[in-house]
């Protein structure tokens, strides 16, 4: 092994090898571009890819803040009265949540155009993150729809979510993470689906973005309709899932041995 390392060092320290470095970099660059062109099929393939990237960039903006309701539309949704106006209990297990994520998450729920919601927060944060509890308690004192409980110990994402469920009083249950944010019209659209389609399980598309700018999207996840084979292979539903409390009657809640994939297990 030492002999091989010695020979490698001799090659790297050779003046000719060092002098040819720029030429090798250029050659490798040309090879990589050639491979990329080959993978795209042709020059037309490259053009198509460039066009797709341009479309994707525009779509990211379109599905960002540009999709938020205008003042007029917000007022219209807030005044809407459905035949069924169920309370939606949103479960959020907390653990050492960064302050910026916490404020954005709670703020997005409070900014919903549909107002009959309940935010259930079970906090397993350690003493070094006491600000989580302080902030949540302050908001809960101002808004009775926010229900907060400090846990004696962190029970993991499944255990903490189960504690959230114990706090819930809504007819529908929503699964949410402490680093998520909701589109302002999300609950309105869900309740609309409940009324128009008698839905008891609802999910939506989602996007990953670079906080704090919602428009700086990294990926967009457009989900299919219910596809059992796909769902058996991967949890394409994920968040934001909302389902009728009746669907949980007689079933086991989240199991800690499936932490990380507890939503899929459920």
Task: Tell me what each language-model feature is.
Residues 1-72, 79-84:
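Boundary detector for helix-to-coil junctions that initiate low-complexity/charged tails
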Residues 97-111:
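Short, well-formed alpha-helical segments that are part of the catalytic scaffolds
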Residues 108-153:
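Acidic donor-binding segment of Leloir-type glycosyltransferases
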Residues 151-168:
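Glycine-rich, basic loop-to-helix element that forms the pyrophosphate-binding segment
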Residues 158, 166, 216-242:
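A recurrent flexible, glycine/aromatic-enriched loop bordering the glycosyltransferase active site
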Residues 173:
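Short aromatic/hydrophobic "clamp" motif used to bind/position activated sugar donors
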Residues 185-217:
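Conserved donor NDP-sugar-binding/catalytic core segment of glycosyltransferases
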Residues 259-266:
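Acidic donor-binding loop at a coil-to-helix junction in glycosyltransferase catalytic cores
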